Amino acid sequence: MEITTFDKLSKEDQALVKTAMEARENAYTPYSNHKVGSAVRTANGKIFPGCNVEIISLQTSCHAERNAVMNMAMHGERVIEALVCYGPYSGVPCAECRQVIWEFCDNNPNVRIIGATTEGEIELM
């Protein structure tokens, strides 16, 4: 894991982080108020946002990363090049989200994962 700053990211990664930041504004979190935004960039450069959506039964809630990947799939894309998770804490995806990411990474174990916090911390995984 590498710690960096927004300014040191490539223009493509900066655009991905900005999309995740915007997506976070649409998060539906009436129970935890833990808003998270995400964005995926496909192998051909398209970007798809996602945000977390809570349901009173938290087990049926959907994480931002999964929503971004499902948005990508809904638009006919199948290969993730990079993913950003943006929220108040470290952006390391949970095990379930990692499984969804793996399903759409074309067996590439080096998919770029960027964790960005509301405090400005950026982690590259």
Question: What annotation goes with each model-predicted range?
Answer:
Residues 33-42:
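Short beta-strand scaffold segments in enzyme catalytic cores
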Residues 1-26, 75-125:
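C-terminal binding/interaction regions
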Residues 19-22, 64-72:
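Short, well-ordered amphipathic alpha-helical segments that serve as non-catalytic structural scaffolds
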Residues 51-60, 64-66:
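Compact, glycine-rich, soluble single-domain proteins
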Residues 41, 71-77:
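Alpha-helix C-terminal capping segments
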Residues 63, 67, 96-99:
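Short amphipathic alpha-helical face segments that pack within enzyme cores
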